[in-house]
Amino acid sequence: LFFQELMDKFQILNLGVSVYNPKEIEILQASEIELSFQFPYNIVDTRFENIQIKGGNRFARSIFLQGLLISSKSIIKSNPKLSSFQKKYHNLLSELKLDGLRVAISKVSYSNKIDYFLVGVEKLEQLIELVNLNLYDMSKLNLLDDVSESDIEIIDPRLWN
């Protein structure tokens, strides 16, 4: 009721919530208000793919997984499990002659489970690069079908040390 009054009073068209796990969406959708959701989604974290969202928009965030999926240079050595995963992932990309940035953007761009995606950039040049990026076709992405990861210590940056 509070949110509906707020939306009516201030002519708010959309109300969104940032969530970390699929269960939160299930709980929040019990409300009467149509909500948009922002959640982590990328080539290795696909936990939200099968969640039905009623009405609101679906925003993917963490599509680069804090940079881990697009750069092999920033390997986190203090976390052996994460470091091992990152090395394996980038070795696979190298073997397949795929670019991590193009893979990340292609994954969310082709997904029918995502309406929008969010990215962070440090410089205008990075944004221009993203806008002008050539996407891989689905056959290239299908080569990575087995990289999905369920280990929460890898896919949730809040748990990295």
Short names for language-model regions:
Residues 1-160:
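Beta/alpha (TIM)-barrel catalytic core signal, keyed to glycine-rich beta->alpha loops juxtaposed to Asp/Glu
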